[in-house]
Structure formats: C-alpha cells, structure tokens
Curated annotation (Swiss-Prot):
InterPro entries: DUF2673 (IPR024247)
Record's protein name: Uncharacterized protein RP697
Organism domain of life: Bacteria
Region forming the signal peptide: 1-19
Keywords: Signal
Amino acid sequence: MKNLLKILLIIAFANPVFASSMQMPDPASVTTTQIHAMSTNAQQDWIASLTANQYNMLSPDVQKWVMENTTDAQKQALGINQ
C-alpha cells in the first residue's frame, strides 16, 4: 500500500512538470507571426531544435526568416545551401 501511495504521489507531481515543458509546434504550422511573438532566446532555441527535415516542412516565408536569422554554422547543420 505504501508503494502504491508513493507511485500515485510521483505521478501527481510529475504531470505538471512535463506539461509545462516546452513543446515545439508542427513545423508546417509555424508562422512568422508566431516567431516574432517569441523572445530572442526562444527563437534561437527553436532554430537549434530544427532538423533538416523539419526545415524543409516550413512554409517559404518561415524558411526565409530562418535564412535571415541563422548563422552559417546553423545553416550548414540544417543543410541549407547558401
């Protein structure tokens, strides 16, 4: 019974932690308006989280924004031809 109580307490307190962790949106649904609403740090974190496949799923205007706001190293990691 004590073990069950421990498990229930862990689950009860773990859910809010996982729920508050940042979730990246579907790349195809991202808009430049959403990006502009982010803090600079959040924008950089989002760029750092992108994979080449996700970059290719972005809309043309978001791809343009990424091109204008990434370093050469980030572009290379995404497989973007400069």
